[in-house]
């Protein structure tokens, strides 16, 4: 999947924080395909990449404002409330995104990997890691800066 692109009427962008994780997953699948072209589809990374595409194309871009994507107070309150998340991969993976209904834009902010699986209370928990990233401003909290950083990479 290349970014930016238009899916279900939404302009879909990837912030560098998401793009880095996504590119690493794509590279892992390409390596698996090169090593074992007959069976790479059975590997966990290949299945995960397929689920990521499905989540983006069939869930996020269909209705980014769905109540199912609200995170409650998992990222704290205040400025982080504008972030949404989708759960997948047996509930262990999270993809965080922001959207603007007015602009019809969705920005994929970050997706956890096998090192940051959802594990409540752990330092490597997806919500804990993403909260720390937001505190450091990468990705940024405000829409204008988020949009600018995203557009600069495309």
From Swiss-Prot:
Mutagenesis or variant effect for residue 94 to A: Partial loss of toxicity
Enzyme's top EC category: hydrolase
GO cellular component: toxin-antitoxin complex
Assigned keywords, A-Z: Endonuclease, Hydrolase, Nuclease, Repressor, Toxin-antitoxin system, Transcription, Transcription regulation
EC number of the protein: 3.1.-.-
Pfam families: Toxin_YhaV
Example GO biological process: regulation of growth
Gene Ontology MF terms in the entry: protein homodimerization activity; ribosomal large subunit binding; RNA endonuclease activity; RNA nuclease activity
Subunit structure: Homohexamer; forms a complex with PrlF (SohA) with stoichiometry PrlF(2)-YhaV(4), possibly as a YhaV(2)-PrlF(2)-YhaV(2) complex like the MazFE complex. This complex is seen to dimerize in solution.
Protein role: Toxic component of a type II toxin-antitoxin (TA) system. Has RNase activity in vitro. Overexpression leads to growth arrest after 30 minutes; these effects are overcome by concomitant expression of antitoxin SohA (PrlF). Massive overexpression is toxic. Unlike most other characterized TA systems degrades rRNA, and co-folding of the both TA proteins is necessary in vitro for inhibition of the RNase activity. It is not known if it has any sequence-specificity. Acts as a transcription factor. The YhaV/PrlF complex binds the prlF-yhaV operon, probably negatively regulating its expression.
UniProt protein name: Ribonuclease toxin YhaV
